[in-house]
């Protein structure tokens, strides 16, 4: 196991615990006398004006559109590294987690649609339970220490990375509405420039980030979700240069602590603060939150485990070393922790709709994710050997 992956897992796990704390603080503030301060903080107007460019948004949207673009930049860097020389490099390594991830996205979406498919508005949230919060899941897994085999951690990492890639595609295809062709054309020119820089072997990360900033503005103005700029830049930064450097890994190494310890916890703090005022039992047991919670807690493990089992039984893929199906099932339950990624998709799905839809969708996410975390931890604790003396 490379030092980079080992460090990645440590940062994600610790960041997951901070993320949980941030969410709890947000929930407390949103339902206490501090509620006014909490809302005022999120509504603080922030403006950037450069020549004719004027971007004015409340702080909440700067977090969701700006800081989350940095998160997706790191996702792009991770996916590229893993595809080229990591846990997803080559068919044999990639096929098992890829099939598992596919099942883990299809089943939750189908279960959600069983509850909400008949409603024209709420059916827009079909992708909410399809996401996995890797930081949260690894944070829960970290509670079991070195009892967890390295191969099981890498399986969760690979599955979650493919899941992230699927979420990126879903956002691009299904949650983009009005499009400005002029801004999109400028974005295409920026992408072409990034591709040319990669082809010419430009190794200066700052050059990619500068063009990436222009790309972010163009995509933001185009109507496509601006976080996609981060993924594109991540894929364009070279993994290796002729002088044996790795601009991609250096940037990933530098950004990871900021993402794990600041950006994702701040996103959780900004988005998990659901006010329970006006929330009713009938609303909490309505089809929207039930569909989301069922998709996360039932659909995720059902899809991941069933697709994994079929892939092995049909000879399409092999079970990774030192892993059994009991452990796969426990991890598949942990993957039902959608949390930040599910909240992010919910904010896109119900943008401009009745605020109650966002409120109840967040409650469904919290219910499903918390249940998946508790049950997944308990099942994994039972599925693992009592003590591991071998360190990796």
Curated annotation (Swiss-Prot):
Function statement: Na(+)/H(+) antiporter that extrudes sodium in exchange for external protons.
Bilayer topology: Multi-pass membrane protein
GO molecular function, one term: sodium:proton antiporter activity
Species, as recorded: Yersinia enterocolitica serotype O:8 / biotype 1B (strain NCTC 13174 / 8081)
Domain of life: Bacteria
A matching Pfam family: Na_H_antiport_1
Principal cellular location given in the protein's record: membrane
Subcellular location: Cell inner membrane
Name of the protein described by the UniProt record: Na(+)/H(+) antiporter NhaA
GO BP annotations listed: regulation of pH
Catalytic activity: Na(+)(in) + 2 H(+)(out) = Na(+)(out) + 2 H(+)(in)
Keywords for the protein's UniProt record, in alphabetical order: Antiport, Cell inner membrane, Cell membrane, Ion transport, Membrane, Sodium, Sodium transport, Transmembrane, Transmembrane helix, Transport
Entries under HAMAP family matching the protein: NhaA
Bilayer-crossing regions: 14-34, 59-79, 95-115, 125-145, 154-174, 179-199, 213-233, 254-274, 287-307, 328-348, 363-383
GO cellular component: plasma membrane
Homology family: Belongs to the NhaA Na(+)/H(+) (TC 2.A.33) antiporter family.
């Amino acid at each position: 196991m490379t030092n980079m992956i080992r460090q990645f897992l440590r940062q994600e796990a610790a960041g997951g615990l901070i993320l949980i704390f941030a969410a709890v603080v947000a929930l407390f503030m949103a339902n206490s006398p501090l509620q006014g301060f909490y809302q005022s903080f999120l509504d603080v107007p922030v403006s950037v004006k450069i020549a004719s460019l004027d971007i004015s948004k409340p702080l909440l949207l700067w977090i969701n559109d700006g800081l989350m673009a940095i998160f997706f930049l790191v996702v792009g860097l991770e996916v590229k590294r893993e595809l080229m020389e990591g846990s997803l490099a080559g068919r044999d390594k990639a096929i098992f987690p890829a099939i598992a991830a596919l099942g883990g996205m299809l089943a939750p979406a189908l279960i959600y649609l069983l509850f909400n498919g008949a409603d024209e508005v709420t059916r827009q949230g079909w992708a909410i339970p399809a996401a996995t919060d890797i930081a949260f899941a690894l944070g829960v897994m970290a509670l079991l220490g070195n009892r967890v085999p390295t191969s099981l951690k890498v399986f969760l990492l690979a599955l979650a990375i493919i899941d992230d890639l699927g979420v990126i595609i879903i956002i691009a295809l299904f949650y983009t509405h009005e499009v400005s062709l002029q801004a999109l054309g400028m974005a295409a020119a920026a992408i072409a420039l990034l591709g040319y820089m990669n082809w010419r072997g430009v190794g200066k990360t700052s050059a990619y980030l500068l063009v990436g900033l222009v790309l972010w503005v163009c995509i933001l103005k185009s109507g496509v979700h601006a976080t996609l700029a981060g993924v594109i830049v991540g894929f364009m930064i070279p993994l290796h240069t002729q002088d044996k450097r790795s601009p991609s890994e250096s940037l990933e190494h530098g950004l990871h602590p900021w993402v794990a310890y600041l950006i994702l916890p701040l996103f959780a703090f900004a988005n998990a603060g659901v006010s329970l005022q006006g929330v009713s039992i009938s609303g909490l047991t309505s089809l929207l939150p039930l569909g989301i919670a069922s998709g996360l807690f039932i659909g995720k493990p059902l899809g991941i485990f069933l697709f994994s089992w079929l892939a092995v039984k049909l000879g399409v893929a092999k079970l990774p070393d030192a892993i059994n199906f009991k452990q796969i099932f426990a991890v598949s339950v942990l993957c039902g922790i959608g949390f930040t990624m599910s909240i992010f998709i919910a904010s896109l799905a119900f943008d401009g709709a009745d605020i109650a839809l966002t409120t109840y969708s967040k409650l469904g996410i919290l219910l499903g994710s918390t249940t998946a975390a508790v049950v997944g931890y308990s099942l994994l604790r039972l599925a693992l050997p009592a003590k591991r003396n071998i360190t990796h």
